[in-house]
């Protein structure tokens, strides 16, 4: 099966910091897994995630080759099937994701790879052309092979470090293939997501605690797109599966989603996003409640089939924990309007992955800050003025170029009235933003940061986080940092103006 090039359309748009055009296309990437790492859960998690991410770099990566001994599969598969060995499973992951053929073998093929990634250390390879990565619990390292720490895999089952290591390595392949105008390639970079710290010395960083005592309370996940996929991806590999996510999204998967939605494959096209995520969770023994609809519908829905205690709490208007993975102002405003006790958010921007904790303390930023609702009225008036200023021929050309039906829009422009099909078509056009750059490793990075933030708070014994905060990782330069957002004085939810309006309405 040939891979549909439309899958790569979003990451081929390019973004700030990258070269104007890719330096190379249709690259062959070889993944070498050393024996000790192939026989570890950490090594297998890195390998699975790497194949999943690299296969989705359609247009840039054309061929994957796995060099590994035939070791037993130790991790829970994310797709249905039975595999005896790790390499058999990795072949299936590439095929499932986008239809990519993955070659395997104990030794490298005669064909020279454009890029090589080593999971572990291999002194026989040309270190000048090779990236290496390792992970341990909450820690991840990526860099040039000559700098790889001399460390054997630990018995840790924690997916946080391995998934972050895979995202880092996939990001380095992307940057090296595309080329940079600014930023840097990572040559010796270690990270701990337990402490949100970075260093060039692997041993200095804290691997953090095990996750076997982690207990996730029921929570509502709003947004089952790329970042939501990444968070659920992490959850499917946890030891403790005693959790109950409520999944809310009104969308289905299209081809352009497959470059970054890590739990969706070609067989999931046109399927409800929440249903697909629920099926992935169910496959590893995690119960969930998928709701295909927007948040407003969810709040007013009877929620038939939801676990009784969770339905009772939500029915009373109480939201203990909500995770936001939506990318539009309206959705974020609606989520903040639930006034959850504990609110976290994950997002991406260009090559940056971000996560925020909103603790609700006095004068702190809320999810509604800097996320104003989109007002289509002015945009609608603007497009109407623009169209009426065109000649009939210019208008027809514009409408055809943007996929709008000329006849019904012409009828509306000449005789405007509400409810007309032409008006509906134009309203849909102005409310749909133009395609933006997105790529899988950034979305995966955001989901991992989100999971790490959630796990840290729970393991610290907090039922509600004591302070708001933001964690950002920039794949362009490898910087990991913590910070805070300033409150938006014009926020429609938490600003003084909003408080004043509420007090007036109560009189």
Report the location of each language-model feature.
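Adenine nucleotide-associated cytosolic modules
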Residues: 1-507
């Amino acid at each position: 099966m040939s891979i549909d090039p439309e899958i790569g359309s979003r990451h081929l748009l390019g973004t700030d910091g990258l070269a104007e055009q890719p330096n190379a296309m249709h690259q062959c990437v070889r993944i070498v897994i050393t024996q000790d790492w192939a026989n570890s859960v950490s090594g297998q998690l890195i390998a699975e995630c790497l194949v999943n991410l690299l296969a989705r770099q359609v247009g840039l990566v054309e061929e994957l080759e796995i060099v590994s001994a035939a070791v037993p599969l130790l991790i829970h598969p994310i797709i249905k099937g039975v595999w005896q060995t790790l390499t058999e499973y990795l072949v299936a992951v590439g095929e499932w994701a986008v239809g990519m053929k993955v070659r395997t073998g104990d030794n490298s093929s005669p064909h020279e790879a454009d890029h090589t990634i080593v999971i572990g250390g291999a002194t026989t390879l040309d270190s000048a052309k090779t990236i290496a990565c390792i992970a341990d619990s909450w820690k991840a390292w990526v860099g040039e092979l000559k700098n790889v720490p001399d460390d054997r895999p630990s018995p840790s089952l924690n997916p946080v470090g391995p998934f972050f290591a895979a995202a880092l390595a996939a990001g380095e392949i992307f940057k090296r293939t595309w080329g940079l105008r600014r930023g840097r390639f990572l040559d010796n970079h270690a990270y701990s997501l337990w402490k949100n710290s970075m260093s060039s010395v692997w041993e200095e960083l804290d691997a953090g605690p095990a996750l076997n005592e982690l207990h996730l309370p029921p929570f509502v996940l709003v947004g089952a797109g790329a970042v939501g996929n990444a968070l659920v991806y992490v959850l499917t590999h946890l030891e403790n599966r005693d959790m109950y996510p409520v999944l809310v999204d009104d969308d289905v998967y299209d081809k352009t989603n497959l470059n970054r939605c890590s739990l969706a494959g070609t067989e999931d096209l046109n399927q409800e996003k929440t249903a697909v995520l629920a099926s992935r969770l169910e496959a590893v023994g995690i119960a969930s409640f998928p709701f295909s609809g927007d948040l407003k519908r969810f709040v007013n829905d009877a929620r038939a089939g939801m676990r009784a205690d969770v339905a009772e709490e939500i029915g009373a208007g109480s939201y203990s924990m909500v995770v936001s993975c939506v990318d539009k102002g309206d959705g974020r405003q609606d989520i903040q309007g639930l006034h959850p006790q504990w609110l976290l958010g994950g997002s991406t921007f260009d090559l940056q992955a971000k996560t925020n904790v909103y603790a609700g303390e006095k004068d702190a930023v809320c999810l509604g800050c800097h996320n104003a609702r989109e007002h289509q009225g002015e945009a609608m008036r603007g497009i109407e003025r623009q169209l009426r200023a065109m000649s009939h021929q210019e208008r027809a050309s514009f409408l055809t170029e943007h996929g709008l039906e000329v006849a019904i829009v012409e009828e509306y422009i000449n005789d405007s009235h509400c409810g007309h099909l032409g008006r509906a078509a134009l309203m849909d056009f102005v409310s749909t933003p133009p395609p933006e750059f997105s790529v899988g490793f950034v979305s995966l990075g955001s989901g991992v940061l989100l999971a790490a933030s959630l796990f840290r708070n729970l393991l610290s014994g907090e039922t509600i986080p004591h302070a708001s905060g933001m964690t950002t990782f920039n794949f362009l330069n490898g910087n990991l940092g913590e910070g805070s957002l300033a409150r938006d004085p014009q926020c429609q939810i938490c600003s003084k103006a909003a408080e004043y309006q509420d007090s007036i309405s109560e009189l």
